[in-house]
Amino acid sequence: MAEITAKLVKELREKSGAGVMDAKKALVETDGDMDKAVELLREKGMAKAAKKADRVAAEGLTGVYVHGNVAAVVEVNAETDFVAKNAQFVELVNATAKVIAEGKPANNDEALALVMPSGETLAEAYVNATATIGEKISFRRFALIEKTDEQHFGAYQHNGGRIGVISVVEGGDDALAKQVSMHIAAMKPTVLSYTELDAQFIKDELAQLNHAIELDNESRAMVDKPALPFLKYGSKAQLSDDVITAAEADIKAELAAEGKPEKIWDKIIPGKMDRFMLDNTKVDQAYTLLAQVYIMDDSKTVEAYLDSVNAKAIAFARFEVGEGIEKKANDFESEVAATMAAALNN
């Protein structure tokens, strides 16, 4: 039987990423054959990964990487926040973002087929990471954004990498683009403009807003406060030319009823129309970047601020770890019951 030296174990660990005991055991089982030991560890890693495949991985990190005029943001998941801080995991996330920005895959299948600097595919890297780290490690999603030479990327990560953002801004500079990305991280817009919102979505969100007003009015009635008006519109998409014209006519009628001189109406109407737009675009303000109040200057929307500095938001992508993933929340009694049931069935 071949002698299993510390040098052999170290070499196998460097090739496979396995722990000391796993590497030594593999060398013993293969009589010191390095190639067979690597293959054995790979097979065991795949088996370990398969056993963990049905686990929920909702923790993790985002990765952001800029490669010339291409930028990538990725989300990689682990089962626990503790593992998400593991150096090997962080390195995998960053390497994933880099290889995707450079490879520009069209979908997850193409992304997983990309070759890492180590020579393994991205898919193999995740199988090996699951085996060596001991938790299910999964590549969830990515977004690619491209720009021209004249445009600027804003790359930003927040909360230790749990949120990753890339934005593209035309005009301004990299610092402005980064500020826009910071706004996106904080305010969570889902699309750039109201033109991207679905009509039924707007209708449903408006109904939710009015339901909240209804509940608020019930509370206000208890303390003799006047009721708040319900919203008729929620988005610019609903504000046709006829609606705008009617709103202006209502304002003029209101000014006339108040006895305001007609010669000063032109100074009053713009402000009241701005208020009308603000009150009737609440859905836009919640979900569209351009309509949100800019966190760096709360006197303006993002669109108005960018206009004031001769800049324009072109595109963005925002990932937050775990969004949309349903986490399992078993209590201690449930875990004990599940363990006992499994033991009885074996």
Curated annotation (Swiss-Prot):
It is found in: Cytoplasm. Its main location: cytoplasm. Gene3D superfamilies: 1.10.286.20, DNA helicase RuvA subunit, C-terminal domain, Elongation factor Ts, dimerisation domain. The keyword Cytoplasm applies. Keywords: Cytoplasm, Elongation factor, Protein biosynthesis. GO terms for cellular component: cytoplasm. InterPro entries: EF-Ts_dimer_sf, Transl_elong_EFTs/EF1B, Transl_elong_EFTs/EF1B_dimer, Transl_elong_Ts_CS, UBA-like_sf. One of its GO terms (molecular function) is translation elongation factor activity. It comes from the Bacteria. Residues 80-83 are annotated as: Involved in Mg(2+) ion dislocation from EF-Tu. CDD domains: UBA_EF-Ts (cd14275). Belongs to the EF-Ts family. Associates with the EF-Tu.GDP complex and induces the exchange of GDP to GTP. It remains bound to the aminoacyl-tRNA.EF-Tu.GTP complex up to the GTP hydrolysis stage on the ribosome. This is Elongation factor Ts. It comes from Streptococcus pyogenes serotype M5 (strain Manfredo). The lineage of its organism: Bacteria, Bacillati, Bacillota, Bacilli, Lactobacillales. The gene is tsf.
